[in-house]
Amino acid sequence: GLVAWLERPKNPTAGGWKVRVADQEINGIHGLLKGDVDGDGKVDLLANSAQPVGAFPNSGAWLKVPKKPRKAKSWERHIFARNDAPGLSHYLGIGDVNGDGRADIAMGAKGGPSDASGMGEWFYWWEASNDPPKPFTRHKLPGKHPGATCIQQAEGNGDGKVDFIATRGHGLGVIWFEAPTWKVHDINPDLEFPHCLQVVDMDEDGDIDAATCAYGSQIAAWFENDGKGNFKTHIVAKEQ
């Protein structure tokens, strides 16, 4: 595997961008996310190490940005989920779930025929330790979720608690988990292979909406939140 960043030249349209390597040992990188993991005000990188082989099998990692990223041969690697993310994990979410001021991390794992472990089809979140270089504590979200891929922290129903919005990108449906019991609610149960997810206030009414592209259904859609966790599907385009 390879995690790298591309340095933009002064004129971004003239010639190539410089490739800077951050890590070469994480294996099976399907998701890459930026976020401040250790609370130092600087953006770090997060990646999954989804393959069951290699130096960090079935794991999740974050990479601390060095003081001189242009000169560093690699970034300082920390494993937040060591061997406890089996089942072909996909994408990551970052945000303070439990209100302790630290950045927690979430992932989904698709499972399915290519998952030799038979331990996928889940959404987990990892509670940040009080010393972020140390491993985080894993928490399982309810249910079995064939094809689980995307998950992001978001306040879904206006109660001030951080919830999760998620998609089963190799399966069916867009859902959200309601804190603190993580009750599962359907946003759209019928979309096939919604393999991406964005959470944002689309209509600028003060609550968080969601958007996805479902390549099985060949639909791009966004989901309007009424502020109480009830979502209405709006089709942006078909045959996509």
Language-model features: locations:
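Beta-propeller-forming repeat regions
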Residues: G1-Q240
